[in-house]
Curated annotation (Swiss-Prot):
The gene is pcm. Belongs to the methyltransferase superfamily. L-isoaspartyl/D-aspartyl protein methyltransferase family. Its main location: cytoplasm. This is Protein-L-isoaspartate O-methyltransferase. It comes from Pseudomonas aeruginosa (strain ATCC 15692 / DSM 22644 / CIP 104116 / JCM 14847 / LMG 12228 / 1C / PRS 101 / PAO1). GO terms for cellular component: cytoplasm.
C-alpha cells in the first residue's frame, strides 16, 4: 500500500480539506512516509492519521504536517527554521525540502538517531540535529525566521519567543489537556501578534533529554 496511487489519494484528500500550497503538497507527495514508520505499519503510512513510533511518541497526521508547514511558510520562503521535536524525522524531511536550513531539537536520542539515518538515506543534508530539551530551543544558533513545535506546550516557552527573529513565525500547539489550540505567533516591531487557529491533539512537550 505504498504505491503512487495511495500517495495521490492522500494529496487529493489534503487538497479537499483546504490545503492549497502547491509546494507543500508536492513535497508531501514525494516524501516516502512509509520509511518513517515501523515496517509493520507501513501499509498505513499514507492514511491521514497519526501513527505510533515508540517511546510514547507519534508521527503526526499528514494533514497537520501540511497545515503547520503552510502556516510557517505563508509569508514567504524561510532560510533558517528550528524544529522542536524531531520525532520520526518526517516533518523534518518535509521542511528540509522547503527551506534552506533546518535545526532540529529532540529530547529522545534513540528517535533522533533513527531520524538522522532516514534523512541521510533521502540525501537531505541541510539539517543539523541537537539532542536536548525542546523547551530551551537552540539559543546558540538563534535567531530563526521560523520555529515549528511538534508537541503541545502547556504555555508558549519564553525561550522560543526570544529566539524568533523580527518578522519570524512560530507555529505551536498550546494547552495541557487532550485537546490543544494551534497558535501562530509572529514577532513584530513592538512585541508579538498571536492568533489561535485550530483545535488539535498532540503529545505533550516534555522537559529533559533522554538517552
Amino acid at each position: 500500500m505504498t504505491s503512487q496511487r495511495t500517495r495521490e489519494r492522500l494529496i487529493q484528500r489534503l487538497y479537499e480539506e483546504g490545503l492549497s500550497n502547491a509546494h507543500v503538497l508536492e513535497v508531501i507527495r514525494r516524501t516516502p512516509r512509509h520509511l518513517f514508520v515501523d515496517e509493520a505499519l507501513s501499509h498505513r503510512a499514507y492514511e491521514d492519521t497519526a501513527l505510533p513510533i515508540g517511546h510514547n511518541q507519534t508521527i503526526s497526521q499528514p494533514f497537520m504536517v501540511a497545515r503547520m508547514t503552510e502556516l510557517l511558510l505563508a509569508a514567504g520562503p524561510l532560510d533558517k527554521v528550528m524544529e522542536i521535536g524531531t520525532g520520526s524525522g518526517y516533518q523534518t524531511a518535509v521542511l528540509a525540502q522547503l527551506v534552506e536550513r533546518v535545526f532540529s531539537v529532540e529530547r529522545i536520542q534513540a528517535l533522533q538517531d533513527k531520524a538522522k539515518e532516514r534523512l541521510a538515506e533521502l540525501n537531505l543534508r541541510n539539517v543539523v540535529f541537537r539532542w536536548g530539551d525542546g523547551w530551551e530551543g537552540w539559543s546558540a544558533l538563534a535567531p530563526y525566521n521560523g520555529i515549528i513545535v511538534t508537541a503541545a506546550a502547556t504555555e508558549v516557552p519564553q525561550s522560543l519567543l526570544d529566539q524568533l527573529a523580527p518578522g519570524g513565525r512560530l507555529v505551536i500547539p498550546v494547552g495541557g489537556g487532550e485537546v490543544q489550540q494551534l497558535m501562530l505567533i509572529v514577532r513584530t516591531e513592538d512585541g508579538f501578534s498571536r492568533q489561535v487557529l485550530d483545535s488539535v491533539r498532540f503529545v505533550p512537550l516534555l522537559n529533559g533529554p533522554i538517552a
